Amino acid sequence: YIKENILSTLNLKNKKKPLEKIKILDIGCGGGLLSEPMSRLGAEVIGIDASDKNIKVAKLHAKKNDLHIKYYCTSPENFITKTKFDVILNMEIIEHVEDVNNFLESCSRLLKKKGIMFVATLNKTLKSYLFAIVGAEYILQWLPIGTHEWNKFVKPEDLINILKKYNLKLDSLDGMKFNIIKDEWSVSSDKSINYI
C-alpha cells in the first residue's frame, strides 16, 4: 500500500530499487518495522522515536541486516535537521501524542512541498474503543492496558481540518482492517476502527 502510493504519487518507475534517492522520515519508528523495508527498496531512511529503548533495538536490527538507516531518539517537534523529506510515515502514532496540532505542524515543516505524508491512526468511534481498547488491551491482551487513550483518537474529519491549517491536503482516505485468522492487515472501505 505504502510503496504503491509513493510510486504513483511521486511518479517513480517500479525498478529493482524503486525508492532510490527518496528521503523518508519514519516517525514513531519503533524497532524499524517500516524503516527496514523502505531502506531495502532503496530509500534514504531516518527513523525517529521518543523511546530510547526502541531506537536501540532498531539500530541493532539495522546493523545486523546491514541496512544504512539513521535512527534518533526524538520527536518531530524537537528534531533538528536541514533535510526536507519526500515521504513522512506517521503510522499508528497520532493517537499517542499530547498535541496533535503541534505534532502535525512540525511534520509539515519537515515535508517537501510536493511530498507525501501517510497518517494511519484509530478513529474516534465506539467500535474503535471496543476493538482497540477493550478487545486488544483487556480481552486479548495483545497490548499492555493503558496503551491507548480513547480521548486521543482522531476522527478523519478532524484530521483533515488540522492538515488544512498546514497547507496539507488529503489525497485518499482508506479503512484498514485486521484479519485475526490470517494475522494480516488489508485495505477496507470500513474506516470505523483504523484508517490511513
Per-region residue spans from a language model:
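General small-molecule cofactor/ligand-binding pocket signal
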Residues: 70-72, 171-174
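Conserved Class I S-adenosyl-L-methionine-dependent methyltransferase catalytic core
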Residues: 1-5
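Acceptor-substrate binding/catalytic loop of class I
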Residues: 121, 141-158
